[in-house]
């Protein structure tokens, strides 16, 4: 028998509904409120009193009024999973919003699920090869790890994300799920069409809950994307999960918390901040079947890294990739800052002695070059010692060799994209450090793949 309640109060996205005291819906159950020509889905958040629940709407509450009937579905919000979701664009409820026709999925998963148990998890640290030199060499990603992507507007976050999607699809046969959490609809729209043009859409599922949507949708959309990823992982796939932006997940939680009447914590955030973040992040992990590797764009409010939202996120990250405007000004792409980016995987026991030594030497030489830049600016390069001149020469070559042509940017750059295996990356930088290529002009190193490509370019320049 259906369990019906009546709407008794509506305050923005918060709805109070009265049920029979014997049949109160469980927490996190989905409710359907019949608003005439449409059904509004809400999620139970609190039990208040003997016979009343407080729910948060996942959709706009326009048109709702007191006295309307609400049906308890008896389960939490469930979203479609499986191969059918690839190439499509969904909202928080798993409904397609791309206008590409009807969607039928054989299977669906609830968005609230437990994290894998300790027995199921894979504990062996394993490198996730991206084929992008600067990442693989200096701040390698962990399979099943969580990576924070930091960068302002227009420094290439989206292109880097697209290249990662392209590389995992073509080189590893893996799939990607992109989750837009509380970001601009225009950016989501641009991303969708750019993915379509660059040919990576067929290997990707997109889930959007943008900044014009109610806080309930923005708070739960990350779970929708994660649930789709978990299905692929359980089928033995390596999945890339992109969350743009993880700060908006916290921000939406803060709005909901205030609306539910909870006493705020530090800086006005929800008292359950660490718990909510943990519940999401703990589900992102490798199991013995497959892995979910997550790349999360992190907005830092007022550039304050001690703000509770980014500070809570940092506790979960295994690696950080920092994109820098000063590097884009040099015309070097991807504009990853080699000295600011870091990774827990940069450990000789995981990546091996050779890779570790080369990475540390590259960082040292770039650090020394940064120190010398002030002297060069004031006195000129001729005033440096012979040893420092050598350091500057090699550092400039390394800086340019850290650039790379991307497959997804081919139509804009006219250069064929390059995927570089880690072994080739390490070998190339080792040879530069050893001085084997001191006689090659630094311009030959810009936008090349392997060191062989550099040598070919140098030969062409001589001709």
From Swiss-Prot:
Xref: PANTHER family: ATP SYNTHASE, ATP SYNTHASE SUBUNIT BETA, MITOCHONDRIAL
Predominant cellular place of this UniProt entry's protein: membrane
Subcellular location: Cell membrane
UniProt-annotated binding residues for ATP: 151-158
Bilayer topology: Peripheral membrane protein
Domain of life: Bacteria
Catalytic activity: ATP + H2O + 4 H(+)(in) = ADP + phosphate + 5 H(+)(out)
EC number, UniProt record: 7.1.2.2
Family: Belongs to the ATPase alpha/beta chains family.
Pfam families: ATP-synt_ab, ATP-synt_ab_N, ATP-synt_VA_C
GO molecular function terms attached to this record: ATP binding; ATP hydrolysis activity; proton-transporting ATP synthase activity, rotational mechanism
SUBUNIT field: F-type ATPases have 2 components, CF(1) - the catalytic core - and CF(0) - the membrane proton channel. CF(1) has five subunits: alpha(3), beta(3), gamma(1), delta(1), epsilon(1). CF(0) has three main subunits: a(1), b(2) and c(9-12). The alpha and beta chains form an alternating ring which encloses part of the gamma chain. CF(1) is attached to CF(0) by a central stalk formed by the gamma and epsilon chains, while a peripheral stalk is formed by the delta and b chains.
Gene Ontology CC annotations of this record: plasma membrane; proton-transporting ATP synthase complex
Key words, A-Z: ATP synthesis, ATP-binding, Cell membrane, CF(1), Hydrogen ion transport, Ion transport, Membrane, Nucleotide-binding, Translocase, Transport
Biological role stated in the UniProt entry: Produces ATP from ADP in the presence of a proton gradient across the membrane. The catalytic sites are hosted primarily by the beta subunits.
SMART domains: AAA
Protein's name in the database: ATP synthase subunit beta
